[in-house]
Amino acid sequence: MNETKKRSIAILGSTGSIGTQTLQVVEEHPDKFEVYAITANTRVDELIQQARKFMPEAVVIADESKYKQLKEALADLPIKVYGGYESICQIVESKPIDIVVTAMVGFSGLRPTINAIKAGKAIALANKETMVVAGELINELAMKHRTPILPVDSEHSAIFQCLAGEMNNKVEKLILTASGGPFRTFTKEQLEHVTVQQALKHPNWSMGAKLTIDSASMMNKGFEVMEAKWLFGVGAEDIEVVVHPQSVIHSMVQFGDGAIKAQLGTPDMRLPIMYALTYPTRLSSSFERIDWNTLKELTFEKPNLELFPNLQHAYTAIAQGGNIPCVVNAANEICVAAFLEERIKFTDMPKLIARAMEKATYILKPTLDDYLETDREIRAMVKEWI
């Protein structure tokens, strides 16, 4: 990092969990970062507060019905105000931006990420759906435009850190750790009666609603396997998921000689966020440290694929390839929304996803338009079933 010049950041999804924690990192090091642009989907009040506090050059609200309110609230400040999803796709191309934090939830993060890569911006990747849906396309674009993609997910950040300095050494496998979520010890019968409130209580991490449900169903871990495949160029057969309830080891890499490197830390998303923003430098932080005196044990177990079929769906989707990962993502987004609205049971989600995988029109080499069409088609189909 150039020590004199501040790194200019755009945060897509600044009012969400990752977005707000990114702003906390900026507050921790105001001499290192400046916020060029922040965007939100619908949370206009939080966006107004953030704009007043961080004074970005530009602010975008995707929900156009909130544009007038945003514009009026910031009228006394020299901030450019935009409305609509297209504006988010365009703002990432702004010349002063050095790094784009893709903290939007779901498929909507894909197009802005593609535009940012084409504009040569470094990507701090928090929107895992981008790699799940279109990992191959993203990798090709990143290579073509020589754009670094820096993982923000704690697991992928851990692997990224473990691989540092190992460029010429054989990687035998990546080991992704999973907390197991709040229902790790449940029976099939208990899972049938899970409530939204129960599912939203994650034992270790603080996250948004969508991600918390994905963690409870282990779909999140499935997505992380897909993401790891594209980020690190390994086959799914070389990615192992291990349940580690304490969430102290964030992930591991096993090398050809049998040695294993692990990255440990407190379950605090600000750590991987900061590393992505400052790579290859490490800044000091005031964040909590591990207390080795109170840490009693680190335990590990196999994931239960019978209880959590979503993880198996992810491996199946990788094996089938083409647009099937996109199918899984679209079906899952509709299922999670329906579960949060209490229209389906927790155990209905993996069943609907499996059905979508069966019914989808298979495309071996999808283009961006194919991904968009698959996404539309599957969402409509699953909505109809619900």
Write out the residue ranges for each language-model feature.
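Catalytic, metal-anchored helix/loop core of enzyme active sites in primary metabolism
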Residues: 1-386
